[in-house]
Swiss-Prot record:
This is UPF0262 protein Dshi_0980. InterPro entries: UCP032146 (IPR008321). Belongs to the UPF0262 family. It comes from Dinoroseobacter shibae (strain DSM 16493 / NCIMB 14021 / DFL 12). NCBIfam families: PRK02853.1 (NF002769).
Length: 159
């Protein structure tokens, strides 16, 4: 399966990220580039290059935009996803992350582990929603979907 070799964030329409959000973005991009699978499905009306691809993520008009370019830099796909299906899971994810960061400072390991398990469960739900929303637009594995969901969370935070 093909993969992503470059990921960028177009946040020109968003408020400037906080230093913490900027750091989360950098970590999410690094993790995604370390290991991912990304393929465009075949279409009758166009040839689909095998990749590798570059991806720019943006939020425009309250929609998540995937702008995909091929190895030569030419756009090979652009698709828009409604943010609606992500809103609650992103909100839940940020709330549980805040609880986790607070817990690390003052709770025993057993309670931290319980919060972390809940965080992973919400993260998995977000990845599943993303897989469903990408159906017919891009083919990714569950690990790539998880990493993309993390990036969507930090992008969505500024929207």
């Amino acid at each position: 399966m093909s993969h992503l070799i470059d990921i960028s964030i177009d946040d020109s329409a968003l408020p400037p990220p906080t230093p913490e959000i900027e750091q989360e973005r950098k970590v999410a991009i690094f993790d995604l580039l370390e290991d991912n699978s990304f393929k465009l499905p075949a279409r009758e009306d166009r040839d689909v290059p095998p990749g590798p691809f570059s991806l720019t993520l943006a939020i425009r008009e309250r929609r998540l935009v995937f702008d995909v370019t091929g190895p030569e830099g030419a756009q090979v796909a652009e698709f828009h996803l409604s943010l609606g299906p992500f809103r609650q899971v992103v909100k839940d994810y940020w709330q549980i992350c805040e609880s986790y960061f607070d817990a690390v400072k003052k709770l025993p390991p057993s309670q931290i582990e319980a919060i972390d398990m809940a965080r992973r469960g919400i993260h998995n739900e977000g990845a599943r929603i993303l897989l469903e929303r990408l159906d017919g637009k891009a083919e990714v594995d569950i690990d790539t979907s998880r990493r993309l969901f993390t990036l969507i969370c930090v992008l969505h935070f500024g929207a």
